[in-house]
């Protein structure tokens, strides 16, 4: 499944193309580029799901976790490093289908809904970045990689909520959402650092976690801090105050934020 890298690469390339060259494109061209990229991503996601769930199961009846890509990015010690890659397990494969489907529908709907809007190309660039961030989050091979894409989701939300940047209400809503979720994400980051320090790994693998020496009593604290990040993205009390104002963005962005940022990331 080496082609799975395209699931992340295509929306990223779409973001670069529209972000850097969008002002020289017509609205129709920009919309077609963004929608075509997501159409291919959706097809690849469904293909991945079909191949993954049709493969023979392990002896205990579970599906094998696959890692088509993985490389060391930041090595700290011989046993502790931050890797980057793609992890395919039942949850991540299922979420690839959900994210690509919802995002593709939003891309298609936006083609008509945003017709004639100023900043049409910029909108599709942000939408591509948002989609890439969510896809990268669910296929992360470790907690730290997940955090990087988690923050990209937050940045993308900020850009889309504040799309109508000439409206003071939209700017205020974008800032509010960004700042409130940053408080939650700070807990997430501290939890990741505590977890890595005491567990000696950032991996999701139960086997490597079981081999980690010492610090077992600190793991629940680390996981509790990580939960704060999820609480912020999910708009749980008392970190829910940003959600009503998030409707200042385009209508379909609010739909994508509610369906994806809150449900998927949270």
Predicted ranges, named:
Residues 1-266:
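...captures the hydrophobic TM-helix bundle architecture rather than a specific catalytic motif
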């Amino acid at each position: 499944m080496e082609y799975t890298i395209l699931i992340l690469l295509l929306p990223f390339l779409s973001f670069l193309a529209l972000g850097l060259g969008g002002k020289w494109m017509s609205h129709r061209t920009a919309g077609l580029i963004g929608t075509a990229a997501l159409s291919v991503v959706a097809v690849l996601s469904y293909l991945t799901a079909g191949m993954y769930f049709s493969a023979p199961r392990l002896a205990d009846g579970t599906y094998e976790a696959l890692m088509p890509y993985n490389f060391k990015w930041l090595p700290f010690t011989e046993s502790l490093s931050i890797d980057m890659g793609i992890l395919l397990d039942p949850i991540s494969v299922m979420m690839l289908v959900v994210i690509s489907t919802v995002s593709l529908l939003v891309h298609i709907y936006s083609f008509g809904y945003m017709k004639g809007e100023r900043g049409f190309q910029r909108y599709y660039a942000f939408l591509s970045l948002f989609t890439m961030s969510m896809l990268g989050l669910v296929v992360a091979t470790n907690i730290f990689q997940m955090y990087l894409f988690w923050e990209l989701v937050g940045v993308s939300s900020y850009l889309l909520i504040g799309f109508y940047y000439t409206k003071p209400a939209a700017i205020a809503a974008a800032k509010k959402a960004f700042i409130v979720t940053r408080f939650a994400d700070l807990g997430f980051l501290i939890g990741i650092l505590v977890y890595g320090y005491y567990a000696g790994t950032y991996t999701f693998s139960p086997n490597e976690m079981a081999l980690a020496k010492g610090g077992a009593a600190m793991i629940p604290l680390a996981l509790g801090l990580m939960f704060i990040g999820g609480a912020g993205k999910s708009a749980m009390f008392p970190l829910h105050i940003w959600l009503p104002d998030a409707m200042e963005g385009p209508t379909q962005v609010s739909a994508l934020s509610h369906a994806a940022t809150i449900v998927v990331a949270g």
